[in-house]
């Protein structure tokens, strides 16, 4: 039986295709035990203000943990979450809108601080929940790489092979960046099929899914994403 997997680092409120690939796969592995990357999307994302201007929404990182793996990185002790919450809601014009979603997001940031990885993972799981509206049949199996493979790998593609083997997956779903930065021959030698999903529609690769929810509403975003997911599953089957 063919099983597809999407393997990705835990980004902070990432863009919609991140979730499209998750929901189009049988398994999602959160790559949380690789090195944190400064100035990446591990601790920041982009939103647009009421005038359509882009701005960074960042969680400030404790400098002492910046060189560690993602699951060891923490946010600054003096980070004022409530102040940031009000600032973001004012900039985006959502101070009196999307109260349930805003409350849930900031509650997760508060509850799982100071660990960046834990915050990101819980936010990803929350977004998956509201997109699927609790429909468990749509959701993939979710694993953390730190729980199923504790070895530190010098070769990142061999790491993927081991994760695929540990979850009994024989097909890996990749976006353009992953496809170009891995040794595809190693995957093929280990009989792992590769699906390049570079059909990112009209989504801006920098903009958070939260921005789309603010602009179009969760029902419209959910409908759009699930429609693409259904197309993807057919597309993936043909590519396996």
Where do the model's predicted regions map?
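Residues lining hydrophobic/aromatic ligand-binding pockets adjacent to catalytic sites
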Residues: 1-240
């Amino acid at each position: 039986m063919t099983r597809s997997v999407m393997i990705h680092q835990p980004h902070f409120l990432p863009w919609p295709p991140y979730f499209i690939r998750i929901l189009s796969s049988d398994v999602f592995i959160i790559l949380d035990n690789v090195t944190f990357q400064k100035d990446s999307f591990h601790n920041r994302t982009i939103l647009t203000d009421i005038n359509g201007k882009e701005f960074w929404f960042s969680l400030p990182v404790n400098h002492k943990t910046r060189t560690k793996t993602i699951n060891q990185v923490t946010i600054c002790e003096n980070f004022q979450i409530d102040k940031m919450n009000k600032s973001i809601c004012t900039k985006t014009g959502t101070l009196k809108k999307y109260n349930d979603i805003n409350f849930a997001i900031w509650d997760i940031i508060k509850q799982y601080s100071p660990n960046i990885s834990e915050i990101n993972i819980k936010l990803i799981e929350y977004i998956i929940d509201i997109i699927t509206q609790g429909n468990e049949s749509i959701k993939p199996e979710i694993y953390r790489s730190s729980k199923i493979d504790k070895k530190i790998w010098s070769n990142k593609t061999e790491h993927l092979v081991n994760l695929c083997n540990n979850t009994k997956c024989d097909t890996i779903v990749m976006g353009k960046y992953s496809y170009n930065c891995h040794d595809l021959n190693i995957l093929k030698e280990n009989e792992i099929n590769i699906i390049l999903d570079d059909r990112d529609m009209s989504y801006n690769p920098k903009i958070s899914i939260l921005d789309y929810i603010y602009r179009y509403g969760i029902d419209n975003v959910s409908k759009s994403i699930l429609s693409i997911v259904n197309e993807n599953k057919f597309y993936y089957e043909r590519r396996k």
